[in-house]
């Protein structure tokens, strides 16, 4: 069991990690942006320690691989939990943690390289003969490309961030006009949250149930 764990995220997921570690008697160190430090959220107060990992924007803090790993090392954390979104599915980040002797709570870098991005994961599923929701064959390079695929599979559709997680970079579209605006909005959000603006498209399943499977 780890003695001290670094929390490389914010908000609800960080609060859950801090709470779970407290129950397991594991010390937590939260990395926080300058804006979150100023807000002094309850989960930051509940953590054993808090360190600044950069500026207010996620790109200057929660997406800074080196800054986060160095903060974890300097606070003597032997493990790091990425939460969801941000760097949770970044294989370079997982590999960097390993290089510095920090246990990354999640899949190893090799597994992530296959499954971290949605489009390659979708391709791997199809190659294995698994059924997938109808949609684009790869990354969409423009709103016009999204509209072409949307009309092929039929509205409603959903635009998704290739590097998505935590519900970010996702937009439902019911017509061509919505798809045009949604493409810009989703790409901007994905770039801000993951440092990757790439999008793909799938048919939106109305009333569908989401079942997540983890293979350990």
Annotate the PLM regions:
Residues 1-216:
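N-terminal beta-alpha lobe that positions the nucleotide/phosphoryl donor
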């Amino acid at each position: 069991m780890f003695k001290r764990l670094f929390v490389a995220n914010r908000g609800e997921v960080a609060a859950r990690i801090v709470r779970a570690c407290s129950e397991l008697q594991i010390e937590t160190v939260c990395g926080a942006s300058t804006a979150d430090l100023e807000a002094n959220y309850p989960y930051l107060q509940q953590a054993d320690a808090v360190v600044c990992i950069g500026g207010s924007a996620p790109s200057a803090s929660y997406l800074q691989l080196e800054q986060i790993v160095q903060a974890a090392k300097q606070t003597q954390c032997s493990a790091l939990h990425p939460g969801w979104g941000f760097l949770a599915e970044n294989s370079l980040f997982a590999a960097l943690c390993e290089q510095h002797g920090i246990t990354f709570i999640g899949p190893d870098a090799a597994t992530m390289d296959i499954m971290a991005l949605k489009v390659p994961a979708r391709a791997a599923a199809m190659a294995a003969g698994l059924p997938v929701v109808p949609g684009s064959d790869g990354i969409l390079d423009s709103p016009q490309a999204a509209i072409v695929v949307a009309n092929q599979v039929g509205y409603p559709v959903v635009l998704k961030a290739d590097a998505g997680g935590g519900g970010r970079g996702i937009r439902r579209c019911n017509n061509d006009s919505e798809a045009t605006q949604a493409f810009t909005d989703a790409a901007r959000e994905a770039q801000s949250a993951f440092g990757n603006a790439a999008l793909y498209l799938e048919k939106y399943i109305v009333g569908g149930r989401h079942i997540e499977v983890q293979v350990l």
